[in-house]
UniProtKB/Swiss-Prot annotation:
Record-level GO BP terms: mismatch repair
PANTHER family: DNA MISMATCH REPAIR PROTEIN MSH1, MITOCHONDRIAL (PTHR11361:SF34), DNA MISMATCH REPAIR PROTEIN MUTS FAMILY MEMBER (PTHR11361)
Region (Disordered) location: 1-20, 854-874
Main function: This protein is involved in the repair of mismatches in DNA. It is possible that it carries out the mismatch recognition step. This protein has a weak ATPase activity.
One Gene Ontology CC term in the entry: cytosol
Alphabetized InterPro entries for the sequence: DNA_mismatch_repair_MutS, DNA_mismatch_repair_MutS-lik_N, DNA_mismatch_repair_MutS/MSH, DNA_mismatch_repair_MutS_C, DNA_mismatch_repair_MutS_clamp, DNA_mismatch_repair_MutS_core, DNA_mismatch_repair_MutS_N, DNA_mismatch_repair_MutS_sf
UniProt-recorded name of the protein: DNA mismatch repair protein MutS
Biased composition (Basic and acidic residues): 1-12
SMART domains linked: MUTSac, MUTSd
GO molecular function: ATP binding; ATP-dependent DNA damage sensor activity; damaged DNA binding; mismatched DNA binding
Amino acids binding ATP: G661, P662, N663, A664, S665, G666, K667, S668
HAMAP family (UniProt xref): MutS (MF_00096)
The gene coding this protein: mutS
Pfam families associated with the record: MutS_I, MutS_II, MutS_III, MutS_IV, MutS_V
Length: 874
């Protein structure tokens, strides 16, 4: 049962039963006669009609309550008790679940992470002053991709909202992070590239135009697969949208209106119709979900996938860039190994650099130069790190100010960050890198805002904007006058107790206050005969009587009115202050980008310095030469000096390396190591090696291990073949291909035939720089037949009763895999090991593989193996 489709009676009742409640509760608001509901529930039902695909959280006193089918969903997802509320005399009890108002953010985060949209209905008038039903309105709509509240976001990850437009095999993609303002669009002609880009972005929500009648339905992860194009994985949250929002003319008009321009030429998407339509549809959705206050977006940026090193989903997964394959954890990933950033902005940017490596050598060199300058100056590094730790998330704070949702603490965080930036500008004044100089040239408005906010805000303001205490005394004369009047009235009340004790002779008389009755004079029952005539009885208690006087009520009324006026005035001045900041949101975000870049580069410099990385030389040829290369993650998990470095040479003689060696000897680690070094180099980082000269690579492909894909009914071997086909259909001579164990998921000789053919195709047709790890030692024959193939092995040291893995990659092919020895080390029973050795002897005696020379169907002289298997006697 989910909120994004109507519930059947049986589903609702079974949900109630599972939650241990009476299944007689009303759970469908659209199946109840509206006029029979209580006035509050009638209003709830009307709002639910307006927001049918969102969970409606309805403020009632100190709780946000949900009713009917939403209550069932909220109770299940948040593991709350499903209870009931009286719905009307003829209706009975309706399903209800509630959450305390102070826990709203925590519960909303859980629901959003589960893919739900949420509509927040708040009380917009004081219940004490309400005539009848308290006035309520939907004040916020949260969807997974439109969240602005920092409490609902992960600090070091973007929260992208994406929009996709499909036309045949062509596609358009736009994405935005409403919390940072980033807004980008692109288009392409291969849907596989679209899926790869979505995998890079990991959007929280994807907008998809559809002709289906259920517009605005939210498909939570894993739901509604039949409503998605087959290429789009159901692992994400999709929102179905009307195609009208994605029409070219409407999209162009909407974008021009948003950015106050007459043409989109300056944004680079004027002649990219699918990209333009996707961007326009995304803006339409934001206009709908943020009606009260538009989301401030940066200018639309158009990019091409051809600007960056392409990484398909399998490569990102196999290289464990942001999470491990084993358990999906961050620790053990490449990002974990290199992230030393001090700010959330820097963390997000480093992730983007890692997933979007560069092709432009000049851009790469600029990052390398900055890292080199930082590595050479320890005092600069220390000072930068100290300052960066004091800078808050400027990108998201600017977004909250621009959207009118920033509170006083947000502005205080900006104030403190601006002060730090002024100091930081002096630190980098004498640097040479453009990245560092971007912080030296601080716009004057930043220092002006720092002064303005410092003069206006108290040092540690409260988060609430409705209770005062935000603005500094002396900043606003009108506020000071109000405060003075309030202080005088408060002092009069403080003095009243002593005055009345003296006037009445009642030594135990006290002045008290309650929210219900206000200020009062308390007299014990034993002293009632001393009460003067001007006292007005207000309340009788067991041991005391409470009174008021006309003057006390007058002072109280004046005090409360003055306090209310003070709060209103203070809020008005605060809003003006927030608008001053909002007017500079784009400038603040530009500075934020510069801070993030310096933070990311400083972290990379720290890693390079303390892990012993070298500066790679990037070239435009096909050379891949690594001396003393190391795996950047594995070496950090081992004691210092334990990792065995290895060399790699491709592209200047051999294009394809056939890598053989025992199980568990480190072949897979070596493959990943080479891929990670190439990737780190193209993101502008130093690399874990003694030296490295690397030709720019346009794509990295990996096929390392495979498992059954139960969701699509594909076997391990079929998954392997699909991944291999993708590589052979997209790789070129500037690609890096890393293959591990092609053909092992089928019969031995079928697998060998496929492995031989794939290796031959890569070497002779594609000429990709390739490392081909295999246990098919017959592939070593390729090196004798093809000039651009070389054999390497991971060597071991053989002792009488064991082997020692040396983890060294040396020229030459191995003739054994030591699989039985690996089984022994893994703990297989001795009888099994002995029998395996007997069977191996028989296989070696009776099975032979001969290689016959013949013309290859792929061209010139390579050979294919001719396999003959004798009858085996076991």
């Amino acid at each position: 049962m989910s909120n994004d489709r109507p519930l059947t009676h049986s589903e609702a009742e079974s949900s109630a039963l599972r939650l241990g409640r009476n299944p007689g509760l009303q759970v469908r608001h659209d199946e109840v006669e509206r006029s029979l509901l209580t006035p509050m529930l009638q209003h709830y039902a009307e709002l639910k009609d307006a927001y049918p695909h969102a969970l409606l959280l309805y403020r009632v006193g100190d709780f946000y309550e949900t009713f009917f089918q939403d209550a069932c969903t909220v109770a299940r997802e948040l593991e709350l008790v499903l209870t009931g509320k009286e719905g009307g005399k003829e209706v009975g009890r309706v399903a209800m679940a509630g959450i305390p108002h102070h826990a709203l953010e925590r519960y909303c985060r859980t629901l959003i992470e589960k893919g739900y949209a949420i509509a927040i209905c708040d009380q917009v008038e004081d219940p004490a002053q309400a005539q009848g039903l308290v006035k309520r309105e939907v004040t916020q709509v949260f969807t997974p991709g439109t969240v602005l509240d920092t409490e609902l976001l992960q600090p070091r990850r973007n929260n992208f909202l994406a929009a996709v437009v499909l036309s045949g095999n062509h596609w358009g993609l736009a994405y935005a992070d409403v919390s940072t303002g980033e807004f980008c669009t692109t288009q392409g002609s291969d849907r596989a590239d679209l899926v790869a880009e979505l995998n890079r972005l990991q959007p929280a929500e994807i907008l998809l135009p559809t002709e289906a009648p259920d517009i605005n339905r939210v498909l939570r992860p894993g739901e509604g697969k039949d409503q998605l194009p087959p290429e789009l994985p159901p692992q994400w949250c999709y929102t179905l949208r009307s195609p009208e929002d994605f029409q070219a003319a409407a999209a162009r008009q909407r974008l021009c209106q948003r950015f106050q321009v007459k043409s989109l030429e300056g944004f680079g998407c004027e002649h990219l119709p699918l990209a333009l339509r996707a961007a326009g549809g995304l803006v339409a959705y934001l206009d709908e979900t943020h009606r009260q206050q538009p989301v401030p977006l940066q200018n639309l940026s158009t990019y091409s996938l051809q600007q960056y090193l392409f990484l398909d989903p399998q490569t990102r997964r196999n290289l464990e860039l942001t999470q491990t394959v084993r358990d999906g954890s961050f620790q053990g990933s490449l990002l974990w190994a290199i992230d030393r950033t001090a700010t959330a902005m820097g963390g997000r940017l480093l992730r983007r650099w890692l997933l979007q490596p560069l092709l432009d050598i000049e851009e790469i060199t600029a990052r390398q130069d900055a890292i080199a300058e930082l590595m050479a100056n320890s005092s600069l590094r220390q000072s930068l790190h100290r300052h960066l730790q004091e800078i808050y998330d400027l990108e998201r704070l600017a977004g909250r100010a621009g959207s009118g949702t920033a509170n006083a603490r947000d502005l205080a965080a900006l104030r403190d960050s601006f002060r730090t930036l002024v100091s930081l500008a002096a630190v980098v004044a004498n640097t040479s890198s453009p990245y560092l100089q971007a912080l030296a040239q601080l716009p004057p408005v930043i220092e002006q805002l720092a002064d303005t906010l410092s003069a206006a805000l108290v040092d540690q303001p409260p988060t609430s904007l409705s209770e005062g205490g935000i603005l500094r005394p002396g900043a606003y004369p009108e506020l000071d006058q109000q405060r003075q009047q309030i202080e005088q009235d408060q002092q009069w009340i403080l003095n009243l107790e002593a005055q009345e004790r003296q006037r009445t002779g009642i030594s135990t008389l006290k002045v008290g206050y309650t929210k219900v009755f206000g200020y009062y004079l308390s007299v014990s029952r034993a002293k009632l005969n001393q009460v003067p005539d001007d006292y007005i009885r207000k309340q009788t208690l067991t041991n005391e009587e409470r009174f008021i006087t006309a003057e006390l009520k007058e002072r109280e009324a004046r005090l409360l009115a003055a306090q209310s006026h003070l709060f209103e005035l203070e809020y008005q001045y605060f809003v003006q202050l927030r608008e001053q900041v909002a007017a500079q949101a784009s400038t603040i975000r530009e500075i934020a980008a510069a801070v993030a870049a310096v933070d990311a580069l400083l972290g990379l410099a720290e890693v390079a310095l303390y892990q012993g990385y070298c500066r790679p030389q990037l070239t435009r040829d096909r050379q891949l030469c690594i001396r003393g290369g190391r795996h950047p993650v594995v070496e950090q998990t081992l004691p210092a000096g334990f990792f065995v470095p290895n060399d790699t040479q491709l592209g200047t003689g051999a294009d394809l390396m056939v890598l053989t060696g025992p199980n568990a000897s480190g072949k897979s680690c070596y493959l990943r190591q080479v891929g990670l070094i190439q990737l780190l180099a193209q993101m502008g980082s130093y690399v874990p090696a003694t030296s490295a000269t690397l030709g720019i690579c346009d794509r990295i492909f990996t096929r390392v291990g495979a498992v059954d894909d139960l969701a699509t009914g594909q076997s391990t071997f079929m998954v392997e073949m699909n991944e291999t086909a993708n590589i052979l259909n997209h790789a070129g001579d500037r690609s890096l291909v890393l293959l591990d164990e092609i053909g092992r998921g089928t019969a031995t000789f079928d697998g060998l035939a496929i492995a031989w053919s794939v290796a031959e195709y890569l070497a002779t047709i594609l000429k990709s720089r390739t490392i081909f790890a295999t246990h098919y030692h017959e592939l070593n024959q390729l090196a004798t037949l093809l000039p651009n193939v070389a054999n390497y092995q991971v060597v071991v040291k053989e002792l009488p009763n064991e082997i020692i893995f040396l983890h060294q990659v040396k020229p030459g092919g191995a003739d054994r895999s030591y699989g039985i020895e690996a089984g022994r080390l893994a703990g297989l029973p001795a009888v099994v090991i002995q029998r395996a050795r007997e069977v191996m002897c028989q296989i070696e005696k009776h099975s032979r593989i001969t290689v016959g020379l013949r013309k290859s169907s792929m061209g010139d002289p390579p050979t294919a193996p001719e396999i003959n298997q004798g009858e085996l006697p076991f």
